[in-house]
Amino acid sequence: MVQAELARGTAAGPYRGLGEFHLYDSANANGPVARKLMALADEKGLAVLAHVDDVATDLLMANTPSRGQQTRLIWAHTGIGGATVGRVQALFARYPRLMGELSYRPGLTCADDQGADRLCPQWRALLLQYPTRFMIGSDTWVNQRWLYYDALTQSYRSWLGDLPPDVARKIGWDNGATLFGLQ
């Protein structure tokens, strides 16, 4: 079924990604469905959006035909459960096409004296180290999340303002647009 759908494409052209999917147990990244999905994405050059922790991310990438070297995985929230900056850095170093999505990311921001969201120093350093590897998203997976959309985008605007303009533009738009062939 998936192969037929991919071959058919969409009115706007071919599919550019698969997902989203959730693995609530990291061990499921070794399962046959996850392995087949990731192999398909790897072979077809499709991006995959996965809500997984750092252990599952490592397994999903390592189990692909390219051993994660050509795999385009969008890591929702840059880790369910809040992987440390060091762990994110290690996975980014190992997998050159791993992308971190930043919605609802625990530990990304710290409140300043006025209560505004500002990037925590270690995250700011990581975003500056890998300016082409992060993107923002909305995570509107249930209707109620739309009630918070304005607040979410305002938070993005606030902490993106802590970055050099070219880096903020990459994270806020360019990286996602490039990933999906929109620019």
Predicted features by range, described:
Residues 23, 54, 142-144:
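Short glycine-enriched loops at secondary-structure junctions
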Residues 14-17, 69, 167:
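Short loop/turn motifs at secondary-structure junctions
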Residues 21-24, 103, 174:
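Conserved residues at the C-terminal ends of beta-strands
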Residues 18, 41, 77, 100, ...:
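Divalent metal-coordination and catalytic microenvironments
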Residues 128, 132-135, 142-183:
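Mid-to-C-terminal alpha-helical segments outside catalytic/metal-binding sites
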